[in-house]
Amino acid sequence: MIKIQTQLCGDVEELQAFMRPEVVSGCDVAVLFALGFPPDSLIPVAKTVAPGVPVFLADCYGIVGFSPAAGRNIELMEAGRGREYGGVGGDGGKGLVAVVFSGGGVVADTDALPPAGAVAHMVVAKAGSDVSSFLAQQATAFYYGGLAKAAYRYVPLEERFEAIPYFFVSTLAVAENPVGATSFTADVKGAVGTLLSQMPAGSRPAAVALFPCFMRGRNEYGINNVEPDAVSALLPGTPVYGMFCHGELGPRRCLGFDSVEKPQQSCTLHSMTTIVAIHAANSA
């Protein structure tokens, strides 16, 4: 069964405390969403993960995650982001969201997607990359994610982060770990509620991925945390992770869980949209 552990941390020291041995030991992949932290500052964190385990990093316009300090799911957006398109702009902040996948059932790569056997792909790509054409050729399951400022993978032998165009974390077809996805531009609770209503019997939500356009959040609502709060109201106690995007990758509509629709018809690159994916786990 896939286990997802995630947290929004205020600084590198808090991130290191979260990435303790009992969290990263035996993990399958670690993903870091960073706002306001250069890659070099995160090398000590990446070194805590076993050399054979992929560690990916996204340099973000903003981040979404569960903050122990705030006791809730929150969002942070870089100062002024969105004013270039007429928005009020983000009000600043720094943070790091760590997402650690363990227990088997996921594969991660930068060059290829599984030719078969996957039920969903999380995709993070550098804005301006050719990720859309790549997905059109290789995706065999629906995808969710978005475009960041930059994407990196950690190179253990060289102790550095290497810039890459994109990375993927694919969930494999394991019965205990269904994944569902939808997209919305309005009615957050309605969209997420519809997806929840399709969750397989005997399952519970384990984590929620949230990938909104950076023209949403404060630029859409005038205040922060509207969408994280709406998700939390429906799924109390469930952690959220993700980032604000400059182009959102995901379904055109609600796909339910473990959809078998061809992603070339069911998914696309969006704008001014929020993508939601719910990871479910067996309730037993």
Question: Where are these predicted regions, by residue range?
Answer:
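Hydrophobic alpha/beta core scaffold segments
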Residues: 1-284
